[in-house]
């Protein structure tokens, strides 16, 4: 099996991405990040999911994006909104996917892997600029210009299997692949036990996705 690095947050989208990469026959090395986010529940979920979904290795990288703040997810002084916002919301973490993909790229070089999977989505999403197809294309170009592998003739590919799927379609896909979505944590403001707030944008999209998919939502909500 070809090796691949799969970014795994512990949420619904990244779990589905890992399951898809496994279905496609990749030997998956899962990578998660403790980046100073509000809660650690998603990292606990990521560890469980990596094992459940058959990753051959799971690495958690510690980076301090809370040192620069600028996001409701890394700065406790900024409240997580309980309603949709116009424009790019305060839950956007500056340069997060650029940083995450850079670490994934470095690990891929070490592993001899040319494939990186990330669960970004540009349909039912919060409007983050680093989830758009044009960002992924630009990063893939960077990856092939800025690495020893690229200079020596190899070619990295950034896989985004969810990019054009609705949340409902993502849930249907993952359910067909046997994912237990009760194990995932998507909420921006989950508590230590992984209970979801039920009102943030991520909870709203998740609830809407299960409803539109016609599948019972296993999420434990506080409200």
Curated annotation (Swiss-Prot):
Residues that bind Zn(2+): 187, 197, 200, 203
Keywords: ATP-binding, Ligase, Metal-binding, Nucleotide-binding, Queuosine biosynthesis, Zinc
An example molecular function term from Gene Ontology annotations: zinc ion binding
Root EC class: ligase
Binding site for ATP: 8-18
Reaction(s) catalysed (UniProt annotation): 7-carboxy-7-deazaguanine + NH4(+) + ATP = 7-cyano-7-deazaguanine + ADP + phosphate + H2O + H(+)
EC number: 6.3.4.20
UniProt-listed GO biological process terms: queuosine biosynthetic process
Cofactor annotation comment: Binds 1 zinc ion per subunit.
Keyword check for Nucleotide-binding: yes
Pathway membership, UniProt: Purine metabolism; 7-cyano-7-deazaguanine biosynthesis
Annotated InterPro entries: QueC (IPR018317), Rossmann-like_a/b/a_fold (IPR014729)
Cofactor: Zn(2+)
HAMAP family given in the database record: QueC
Role, per record: Catalyzes the ATP-dependent conversion of 7-carboxy-7-deazaguanine (CDG) to 7-cyano-7-deazaguanine (preQ(0)).
Family according to the record: Belongs to the QueC family.
Name recorded for this polypeptide: 7-cyano-7-deazaguanine synthase
Species per Swiss-Prot/TrEMBL record: Methylococcus capsulatus (strain ATCC 33009 / NCIMB 11132 / Bath)
């Amino acid at each position: 099996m070809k090796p691949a690095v799969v970014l795994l947050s512990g949420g619904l989208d990244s779990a589905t991405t890992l399951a898809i990469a496994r279905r496609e026959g990749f030997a998956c090395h899962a990578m998660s990040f403790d980046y100073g986010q509000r809660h650690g529940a998603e990292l606990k979920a990521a560890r469980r999911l990596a094992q459940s979904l058959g990753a051959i290795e799971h690495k958690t990288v510690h980076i301090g994006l809370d040192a620069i703040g600028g996001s409701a997810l890394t700065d406790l002084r900024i409240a997580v909104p309980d309603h949709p916002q116009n424009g790019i919301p305060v839950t956007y973490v500056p340069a997060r996917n650029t940083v995450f993909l850079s670490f994934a790229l470095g690990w891929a070089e070490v592993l001899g892997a040319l494939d990186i999977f990330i669960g970004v989505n540009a349909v039912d999403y919060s409007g983050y600029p680093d989830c758009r197809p044009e960002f992924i294309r630009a990063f893939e170009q960077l990856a092939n210009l800025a690495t020893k592998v690229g200079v020596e003739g190899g070619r990295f590919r950034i896989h985004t299997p969810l990019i054009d799927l609705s949340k409902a379609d993502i849930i249907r896909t993952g359910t067909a692949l046997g994912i237990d979505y009760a194990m995932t944590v998507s909420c921006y403001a989950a508590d230590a036990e992984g209970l979801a707030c039920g009102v943030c944008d991520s909870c709203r999209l998740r609830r809407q996705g299960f409803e539109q998919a016609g599948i019972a939502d296993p999420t434990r909500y506080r409200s």
